[in-house]
Amino acid sequence: MNKDLKGLYAALLVPFDENGQVNEQGLKQIAQNAIETEELDGLYVNGSSGENFLLNTEQKKQVFKVAKEAVGDKVKLIAQVGSLDLNEAIELGKYATELGYDALSAVTPFYYPFTFEEIRDYYFDIIEATQNNMIIYAIPDLTGVNISIEQFSELFNHEKIVGVKYTAPNFFLLERIRKAFPDKLILSGFDEMLVQATISGVDGAIGSTYNVNGRRARKIFDLARQGQIQEAYQLQHDSNDIIETVLSMGIYPTLKEILRHRGIDAGLPKRPFKPFNEAHRQTLDQLIAKYDL
């Protein structure tokens, strides 16, 4: 516990069968691929990329357990436990903490127009119940929740709120957060903006495409930190070509198809997501070949 949490993480994909059940063997393969093949520093488990909000509580626990079994103590593990049901978030947080996850993360409560005080207390309640470190998951495009610099300050006053997963295009706010809180962890959540985020001083990044493009992301991150911006941007252009094509075909089914191409039992997306559209097969094959995926 309490490892240095800086670095690059796969936002772990989760394979499902045709009945929407977790494929445990495939999940272990996906986790091991992220660490052994993509050479990432850790896993961010049960986030958006794991289709978390389509899972019941027992399935979420199953994913936490299997991911931990797959990689053990070799890498850093962050458990996303956020839920509209605070009791579930606490239950999941306790479970992940008992499994040995290095930190918790929680998406801001969404759908209902919660006040900041309600959002703040949601985080404080999870921390009090689990006594684990917390990383705020800020993703306003999906939650509709925008946290101001003043509100970040109030959250960061809690010693166990150690950082933020920042998935937002507002680089002015990112710069303000970095300047105001130099000792807090900032992990970028936008794969397509890794160069810009690194220049802005983030400590690492969490990405869904890092499941298949992690080595290229590592080069981008390292080059940008070394001031080799032109070289980093060239690789970012390549990554964004990959991302743009993947998004056009459906992100989760397409990433799973790339993993399947590697011999990994990557399963299906969970309904109502649809499986990979075979009409895109030629485009996918060309993408894999061109970018050595």
Curated annotation (Swiss-Prot):
GO CC terms in record: cytosol
Protein's cellular compartments: Cytoplasm
Activity's dependence on pH: Optimum pH is 7.4.
Gene3D superfamilies per record: Aldolase class I
InterPro entries per UniProt: Aldolase_TIM, DapA-like, NanA, Schiff_base-form_aldolases_AS
Organism: Staphylococcus aureus (strain NCTC 8325 / PS 47)
Organism placement in taxonomy: Bacteria, Bacillati, Bacillota, Bacilli, Bacillales
Record keywords, A-Z: Carbohydrate metabolism, Cytoplasm, Lyase, Schiff base
The name this protein goes by in its record: N-acetylneuraminate lyase
Catalyzed reactions per annotation: aceneuramate = aldehydo-N-acetyl-D-mannosamine + pyruvate
GO biological process, one term: N-acetylneuraminate catabolic process
Active-site residue list: Y137 (proton donor), K165 (schiff-base intermediate with substrate)
Highest taxon listed in the record's lineage: Bacteria
Homology family: Belongs to the DapA family. NanA subfamily.
CDD domains (alphabetical): NAL (cd00954)
